[in-house]
Each structure stands twice: as structure tokens, then as C-alpha cells.
């Protein structure tokens, strides 16, 4: 069974490391970003190069 996780702020810093860790554990990753699209795309490409079709990006402004 595949598991999927949505990681907010995953394009940089701690969120990025969390995404990489879950990817190493075999999870599908949804990478959230607000304005760091290039960083999110780079991370998705990095994850997908090791585990094809397991990472996707989504943009959302989560300010409340």
C-alpha cells in the first residue's frame, strides 16, 4: 500500500529534509510551496530521479 504525505513549506530547509526522509521511506510526496516554485521543482525532480513519479508540487498561499 502506497502512503502519501503533504508537506507544507517543503521547498526549503526543514520541510525539504522531511520530504527527502519520507521519500527514502517509500512515501509519495506532495511538495507545497507558496512562492519558491523553482526550489519545489528542483526537489520534486531530485525525488523523482530516485523514485519515479512519487513527488508532485502544489502552490497555495496558506496565510490565514
Predicted feature locations:
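Rossmann-fold cofactor-recognition segment
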Residues: 50-64
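Aromatic pocket-lining residues of Rossmann-like dinucleotide-binding sites
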Residues: 22
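Short, conserved SAM-binding/catalytic segment
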Residues: 43-51
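Conserved glycine-rich Rossmann-like NAD(P)H-binding loop of the short-chain dehydrogenase/reductase
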Residues: 25-42
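Structural signature of beta-strand start/N-cap positions in the alpha/beta core
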Residues: 4, 28, 54-56
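Conserved glycine-rich cofactor-binding loop
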Residues: 4, 9-13
